[in-house]
Amino acid sequence: MAFVSLLTILLAISSSSVALTEPVASMADQGVFPEQHGRGHHGVFPEEHGRGHHRGGREEEREENPYVFHSDRFRIRASSEAGEIRALPNFGEVSELLEGISRYRVTCIEMKPNTVMLPHYIDAKWILYVTGGRGYIAYVQQNELVKRKLEEGDVFGVPSGHTFYLVNNDDHNSLRIASLLRTESTMRGEYEPFYVAGGRNPETVYSAFSDDVLEAAFNTDVQKLEHIFGAHRRGVIFYANEEQIREMMRRGGFSAESTSASEQPKPFNLRNQKPDFENDNGRFTRAGPKDNPFLDSVDVTVGFGVLNPGTMTAPSHNTKATSIAIVMEGEGRIEMACPHLGQEHGWSSPRERGHQDINYERVRARLRTGTVYVVPAGHPITEIASTNGRLEILWFDINTSGNEREFLAGKNNVLQTLEKEVRHLSFNIPRGEEIEEVLQAQKDQVILRGPQRQRRDEPRSSS
């Protein structure tokens, strides 16, 4: 019983919980992920009934779980028969709990085979991750065109205000991109595209200028300008024929004909890098400010993790960074401790009752391909993979300089670092060896065997 009592102290979270009651937020619905082909109105996930706090017989998930997003929260930014761009809303609009990351936006892009995205720039720094397909990106830097090939697993950054375009030169597969924007607009969390080429659909930035200004700027008659700037009506993403695509590829620029262009950053592939951590349960790879100058400029770390079937990440938290995670493939679930939701439910606070009566809400959600979830700094979380297959997760850590990951369980758990006497006094367990037995029972670290595999493979420590 002593062991059970200690385990309860170590792992207890309020019995109240927040569960999803509708399909979880999915960019899979938008075709960002190659294994998802349909885009039905109701998404790809069956409705799940919750077991948390109910109001009127049903949870108000938007109010009580602001950390996981439904597919209907994605907004179409641009759409045509050749592809589309979608974005989550401003995080600050979703909940006051997310105002600290309102400057950041999550977007997704799908471009059908043999398509081009119009040249434009945005008032945001753009970190892209290629979730499927291949193609290339071209952007203007120091009055030169820099072209970089893209393939699945690549990470690349485009500075704010620099004109760029994307090309899918594949004959068969769509180019799919998930990305994070850090907006630079005076309107916090808002970003806009500025098209320097186009016509009627979409309009270009030239449409805002008067005819006489344009005539003078281009030294060209306004009738000819109207013909040029009014011809395109095919949308932001449009088809090109195979010969046009081949000509763009023949034109070169990938090896950079000038010294200044060759010095520009190149994509790096997270999937092909040596893992930062790996054991029998899974692995993860990450790149941050110290590894890439663009990531340094936005203070973001990008990571990619794989959990093998039936495994879990050890409960842990970021000391400083907030994580925005996207499930690339697989199924599972998350559990996260949150003190703020407990306060929203009206539970007593230390000031009200005069003692440290703190309640942690268990935030939980099913994970499927395309689920997006936010993990605020300091919030302990665990991701648990289904026994049916691997769980692959892409994440962006925001405000990552000086951040550390502290593990609350596993061989390297933070309690092991504390002085033994402090551990014994803090848990108020007379026999100190019981505490040490519990803390040393787990031989793995970072990625562990999950609940189902633990029950199947070996008995737990008991006394």
Curated annotation (Swiss-Prot):
Expressed in seed. This is Vicilin Pin k 2.0101. Residues 74-226, 268-435 form the Cupin type-1 domain. It comes from the Eukaryota. GO terms for molecular function: copper ion binding; nutrient reservoir activity. InterPro entries: Cupin_1 (IPR006045), RmlC-like_jellyroll (IPR014710), RmlC_Cupin_sf (IPR011051), Seed_Storage-Functional (IPR050253). Belongs to the 7S seed storage protein family. Seed storage protein. Glycans are attached at residue 399. Stable up to 80 degrees Celsius. Cu cation binds at residues 338, 340, 379. Keywords: Allergen, Copper, Glycoprotein, Metal-binding, Seed storage protein, Signal, Storage protein. GO terms for biological process: protein homotrimerization; seed development; seed maturation. SUPFAM superfamilies: RmlC-like cupins. Residues 1-19 form the signal peptide. It holds the Pfam family Cupin_1. SMART domains: Cupin_1 (SM00835). The record marks 55-56, 260-261, 353-354 as: Cleavage. Homotrimer.
